[in-house]
């Protein structure tokens, strides 16, 4: 039976679902919350979004603070009463008028003047200067400072007016208004920092913030705790001290005052710390989601750095790591293209060393017929395009049959089967690849004739060269024999020849595609070699897979 969720877990799940900041949700927005929009959003629309978020939260936080202050003055300190022991024009005239005026003017001034002036560079799509970045990062502090000033002015004004009727009101009003003002300012500071993430991200692109403007996670946490919990608790202690000195509350009234202040402190303190934890967790969750994508092989895109604390450094570090991985993959891809995927993989597994090893392998040598005439009679660009089409067919079939293109030499290519990766029957792979190459060349590039030679046997495969520069290559009789067979195949009707020894070592299935022919003595050899060639197919009988047909269509359209 599953455990029953606590109230905190339910509230946390509700907030995470609403803001889409939970790491278990299907995707994590770039700024940590869908409320902040997308990275691609236009500056004008982003400004409207920020203005609405800041306005709504400032209004909500201040109205809540006003209600709480009224409840504290009314129920926590019932004696003297602001309704019966003070002038009515203060309670029902000046206090509501100042609250309304301060809320309207303060909200307008903060959103239209302070916020807009600090992020004007972002609205105008200008690169931020150092001063712009400083003003943007200081904006949450300025918003909180404006709230403290307005609440302190209101507290001083009301304390003075109420104090004319009873001096006890001075302490009560100053205490209640100051405590609520601090809590409201703290909440507005945190939420303004949240709303400004998209603009802060742009500011942080210009460089790391000065340390004095980014107190770090520890500094931010302790500041929020001090303002959200430390100050209210101090207020409770002040209340007790006030009662001890003034003696104007009964035990029941004192208990009620402490209870109300404690509940207020718990609620506001919990809310402030919850928002702080929520904002702190967002960058971590964004990084965690990005790490999951990297784990799955997705290296596209960088994180948006929107936090000025150590979490922003974490985001920068992640971006640096991904950039390094992308560069590594790019170098790996280039290395694999130059030396072959198998050779590159072997070099990654172990440190390359000069030397070689005996291997049983098969070799395929492919060379274009009449390449000199082709180069002399065609423009260079056309020749290069033709060679690329030719080698694309060769590489495709060699890869498909688990071979390795060891090198390109002008208009010729040398392919190895069985090195560096071992194959159970390298002869089968080499013969099948050679047949496929011959078939595709005849069907896809009839204007190009090429000779193909196949031989198998013992070779020496390894790194040859010097310590400063070496390459993986193969040497041995099969290599030379394949080259001689390739020369001979240029004048053979099938354009493809293999040695009988290679054919005998192949499987019965592969041998069924070949026929033994005449015996010749290859140039440079004393022993005769019996030739083998594939069965001749009637014109138009060449079988093409859907993949090859699509490649032909693409080449012709291109």
From Swiss-Prot:
Keywords: Cell membrane, Membrane, Transmembrane, Transmembrane helix
HAMP domain boundaries: 279-330
Matching InterPro entries: A/G_cyclase, Adenylyl/Guanylyl_Cyclase_3/4, HAMP_dom, Nucleotide_cyclase
Bias-annotated ranges (Basic and acidic residues): 545-558
SUPFAM superfamilies: HAMP domain-like, Nucleotide cyclase
Membrane topology qualifier: Multi-pass membrane protein
Family: Belongs to the adenylyl cyclase class-3 family.
PANTHER family: ADENYLATE CYCLASE, TERMINAL-DIFFERENTIATION SPECIFIC-RELATED, BLL5647 PROTEIN
Protein name from the UniProt record: Uncharacterized protein MT1361
Species assigned in the record: Mycobacterium tuberculosis (strain CDC 1551 / Oshkosh)
The organism's taxonomic lineage, starting at the top: Bacteria, Bacillati, Actinomycetota, Actinomycetes, Mycobacteriales
């Amino acid at each position: 039976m599953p455990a029953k969720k606590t109230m905190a877990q339910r509230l946390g799940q509700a907030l995470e679902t609403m803001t889409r900041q939970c790491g278990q949700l299907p995707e994590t927005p770039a700024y940590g919350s869908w409320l902040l929009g997308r990275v691609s959003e236009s500056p004008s629309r982003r400004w409207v979004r920020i203005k609405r978020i800041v306005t709504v939260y400032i209004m909500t936080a201040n109205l809540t603070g006003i209600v709480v202050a009224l409840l504290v003055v009314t129920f926590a300190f019932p004696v003297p009463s602001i309704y019966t022991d003070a002038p009515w024009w203060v309670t029902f005239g000046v206090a509501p008028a100042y609250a309304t005026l301060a809320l309207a003017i303060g909200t307008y001034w903060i959103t239209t003047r302070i916020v807009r002036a600090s992020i004007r560079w972002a609205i105008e799509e200008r690169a931020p200067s150092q001063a712009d970045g400083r003003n943007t990062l200081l904006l949450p502090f300025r918003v909180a400072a404006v709230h403290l000033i307005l609440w302190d002015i209101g507290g001083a004004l009301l304390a003075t007016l109420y104090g004319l009727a009873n001096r006890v009101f001075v302490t009560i009003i100053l205490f209640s208004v100051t405590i609520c003002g601090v809590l409201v300012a703290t909440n507005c500071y945190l939420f303004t920092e949240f709303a400004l993430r998209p603009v802060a991200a742009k500011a942080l692109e210009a460089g790391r913030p000065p340390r004095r403007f980014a107190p770090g996670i520890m500094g931010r946490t302790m500041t929020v705790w001090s303002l959200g919990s430390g100050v209210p608790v101090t207020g409770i202690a002040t209340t007790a001290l006030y009662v001890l000195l003034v003696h104007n509350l009964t035990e029941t009234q004192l208990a009620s005052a402490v209870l109300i202040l404690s509940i207020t402190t718990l609620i506001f303190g919990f809310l402030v710390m919850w928002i702080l934890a929520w904002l702190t967790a967002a960058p971590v969750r964004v990084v965690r989601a990005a790490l999951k994508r990297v784990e799955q092989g997705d290296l596209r895109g960088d994180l948006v750095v929107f936090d000025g604390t150590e979490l922003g450094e974490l985001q920068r570090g992640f971006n640096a790591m991904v950039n390094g991985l992308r560069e590594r993959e790019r170098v790996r891809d280039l290395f694999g293209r130059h030396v072959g995927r198998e050779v590159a993989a072997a070099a990654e597994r172990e440190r390359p060393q000069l030397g070689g090893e005996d291997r049983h392998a098969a070799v395929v040598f492919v060379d274009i017929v009449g390449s000199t005439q082709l180069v002399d009679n065609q423009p260079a660009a056309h020749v290069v395009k033709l060679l690329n089409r030719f080698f694309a067919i060769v590489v495709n079939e060699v890869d498909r049959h688990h071979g390795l293109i060891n090198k390109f030499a002008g208009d010729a290519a040398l392919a190895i089967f069985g090195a560096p990766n071992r194959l159970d029957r390298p002869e089968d792979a080499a013969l099948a690849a050679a047949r496929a190459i011959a078939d595709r060349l005849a069907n896809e590039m009839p204007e190009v004739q090429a000779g193909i030679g196949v031989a198998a046997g013992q070779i020496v495969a390894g790194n040859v060269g010097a310590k400063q520069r070496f390459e993986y290559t193969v040497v041995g009789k099969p290599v030379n024999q394949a080259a001689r067979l390739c020369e001979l195949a240029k004048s053979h009707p099938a354009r493809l020849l293999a040695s009988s020894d290679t054919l005998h070592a192949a499987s019965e299935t592969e041998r069924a595609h070949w026929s033994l022919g005449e015996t010749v003595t290859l140039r440079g050899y004393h022993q005769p070699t019996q030739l083998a060639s594939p069965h001749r197919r009637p014109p138009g009988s060449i079988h093409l897979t859907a993949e090859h047909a699509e490649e032909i269509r693409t080449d012709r359209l291109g």
